[in-house]
Amino acid sequence: MENVKYDKKYFEQRRAELKNIFDQIKPDLQDLADYFAPNAVRFIARNINKPHVKSKKILDSTTFIAVRNFASGMMTGATSPTRRWFKTGIMNRDNKKNKMSYAAKLWCSNQAELSRKILYASNFYQLLPEVYEQLGVFLFSCMTMEKDYDNVANFKVLPIGSYYYSKDGRGVVDTVCRNYMESAKNLVERYGLENCSDAVQQVYKARPNDMFEIVHFVEPNREYKEGSPISAQKKFISVTYEVGNGTTSFLKKAGFDKFPYVVFEASCNGEDAYPSKGCGIYALPDAKQLMSMIKELGKAVKKMVSPAYQGSASLKNKRLSDNPGFFNEDGDSGAGIRPIHEVNPQVLDLKNIIAELRENIKSIFYNDLFAMILNTAERGRTATEVNELKEEKLVLLSPLLEQIHTALKQILDWLFNTEMEAGILPEVPQELEGEEIEIEFISTLAQAMKAQNISSMERFITFTANMAQAVDPVLIKKIKGEKMIDDYADFANIDPNQIAPNEELEALRQQQAEKQAQAEQMQQLQAGSE
């Protein structure tokens, strides 16, 4: 393993490298912010507690509405706090998932319920809309994951531009450099007075709310030793330090077994560090054209309502008015007063173009898809019916949803590890010891994409029953009833607590067989006595 001196100079060099890469996309991010989210970027850490940015380029609320609806749709469709949107299983090796005992399935259900309760008690759901807004506009968003004494877990969403990241050879984010501001009071309380710079110590008592720029850097540890309890030998190295202030030491140097950041991303182009394919980029040309058309419409209406006038030179110094009943003396010319331009702007055509651009922007942010799902849900339709109505639209959403699921899996994996360290997991059945946990998503959107499996099963059962009735009754035995019911329950997201285990069914069959045997024996005895 290559020896590396993990000092402040090393991490400042790494920060500069990551910043150079990020600076290449910075103009694009600013362009997106100007039209969709003016207050979402913070390229300079010290730009905090500033007045809200008012973009002069936004002349219509369509972009705001499209982004808001996208975030709301993702919350409702993918991660609604009011429904079970994920469940826990065991990694599907050699079809092992389908061979789990009832006790194992019940443990998985209880573990997933524990994770849901922790997420609900934390600030996770309050922050997710902001994550989805950033993801929709800028194509990526970053969230921190921290252990919390009161709620087990705590999360933060970072402003766009306040951090840089890089990936490993598999395309997985494994390095994050975050720049942020912290008050002297918070620095002393968190890291101790003796670990802070002289500048912090000098203002701590007199001006505790003075802000200082801080860097938090996490990357793979080149001194990593698997299973080591020593912080310096954990899988990821973590350092926190002040920018400048003449210090060479760290506020804190630690290590993590699990990466403490999760990055939500849209699609990347090859080996690019940052994504370049997503809603914001696709909708930007329409947004620019929309604002231009809004401006032209305003000019046209203004010329019609309040045009510039022309008249005789003799009227120059006379008082004129367009008030009702007022008499304007025309002089000798008889030409009167009339608009300079006798034009009829094509206002209707402009309005049609504007309406089309608005719909394009909303469609790019999947507003029509989410509206369809919510409207059909209100009429009591199931995810299966939604899928039958607009299956092609769900297919369009599928790539982005898979990217979101990848990030959510990382959060749930980190949360499982935190539960295990805190000792609050349910007692693990012996058959699951050493097995790898698998997360399956069962949200409205995920279920809609899986609904075709349920339809296929129902058609197969109907077909087999008809064949058995028409051709040979023995054909009904082709259906493995218990397996079909278990699979149906899995696809339909039925709680295992609501399903009797196969062991109980086997016991019932045994009881029925014994009763039938006893009845037959009694009949034989009665027949013999006669």
Model segments located where?
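Residues in well-ordered beta-strands of folded domains
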Residues: 144, 164, 240, 438-442, ...
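Alpha-helix initiation and N-capping motif
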Residues: 112, 124, 184, 287, ...
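Short, well-structured alpha-helical interface segments that form or flank functional binding sites
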Residues: 138, 285, 352, 356
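Structured, contiguous alpha/beta core segments that scaffold functional sites
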Residues: 10-12, 16, 23, 147-323
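C-terminal anchoring/interaction modules
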Residues: 1-24, 28, 306-530
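Short, Φ-rich (hydrophobic/aromatic) sequence segments
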Residues: 62, 66-78, 111, 115, ...
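Extended, helix-rich architectural segments
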Residues: 1-202
